[in-house]
Amino acid sequence: MCTHEDSRPSPSPLAAAAAAHTVPPQRSRRGTDTARSPPGARGGAAPRPMRVMIAPMDASHLAPLLTPAGWALLADLPPYDESTVLSVGARLREAGHPPEMVAAALTQQRLRTRAEAKFGPFASRMLFTPDALEQATRLVVSAHHAARYEHAGVQHVADLGCGIGGDAMALAGLGLRVLAVESDEATAALATVNLMVFPEVEVLCADALEVDLTARGIDAVFADPARRSHGHRIADPEQWSPALGRVLALRDDVGALGVKVAPGIDHAALPTDAHVQWASVGGEVVEAGIWCGPLAAEGPGRSALVLSDPPPASDDPRDAPSARVLRDPDCHDPSTPPVHLAPLADVGALGAYVHEPDGAAIRAGLVAHIAERLDAAPVGDRIAYLSGDALPDASLAPFVHSWRVREVLPLNLKMLKTRVREHDIGSLELHKRGVPVTPDAVRAAVRPHGQAHETWIMTRVGNAGDAQRARGAVIVVEPCEAPTVPVS
């Protein structure tokens, strides 16, 4: 059920359409009508009409799809193809479909194609706007959020700032009751459609901090404060909406609190008694999560969660991406600054390998821990490249990308251009940290046109405070075969 906290009448076209819309059921393999649920869902649930009482909003371009004709048109569209979209649109209009319905359906099909990276096959039955899709949590990450709540034994979760409903989907898929709260009326209406197959979910259009959690029997909260304003990221957590401090204050009423925050958050802004976990998917750092009370079973500290890509393609748990967690055993207060190690003395101290920790491990302050396990050192002062003579073992390999060092050159564009010509290099893979050059500028300067391939790491070697010994270098490397990691 989707309601407005103030129960205001006169719903907008989109809200009215969402109120009347029922997603057609899908025949399951068991022979019953059911909607497909995210991985881990305990059976499907028959969709049902929902009551919507929300204020007018400017999202009428989606309303044509929330009719039987609009939904049928969207369901019958072929896979989105940029090269044929104009001809498909013309054909549909010639067949008598209203132009606004055709435009909305084609736009939605394009967004669904983009959304597959976050929601896998479930994107094909969801509705999106560009902004809402960009801000949505990947389903593979939401599944890990939901697992914390299930393991904590909670029953009724308030998803504050639910967006289009990704985290609420994952929570409901594990059988938890969910109150999904969203202050933006248009986004709340989308969540209504995306979540209506889950009878355990109520969508509420309201200010997240105005909801009486106690009166509604809420025993856990997941919050996702808005971190953008007019298209720009907001760095200060106290300028988020709602402010991080106000969200953390909810622990006075509900001890089981989880908060999705920006991965670049300053460690000093973190609560001292929480566990904070940074997550990356396919090598991309996507978020940090603050976990409090029973949701932090591992205790206060910091960790990195590394998930493989792409998202799951079926309901079979064996198809789920692998997940690895690395924790700093010496950190019991996430607000403390990370340990910084002394760098190599100079280029001559480089080992046989260069290692780059995963971005989630870097954000979590785990570089020193990884260096210790590898018996390695940073190549430069506060540079996240490590060098040593050992490769990571299977337990550490998911958190480190390793290369074998072939040669070390000065960061001199004239000399590099000569190398490219003499070695017939036509393809360059460039990485950089700590030097004032860009890969594009280097590639343009050296002009690779040959047949060979090389990988260069451009970085600073040595202590930045020692001008005589620290210098820019190009480390020519080749990939190493990672140790086999058993699938969990």
Language-model-derived ranges and their functions:
Residues 16:
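Extracytoplasmic catalytic/substrate-binding loops of multi-pass membrane glycan-assembly enzymes
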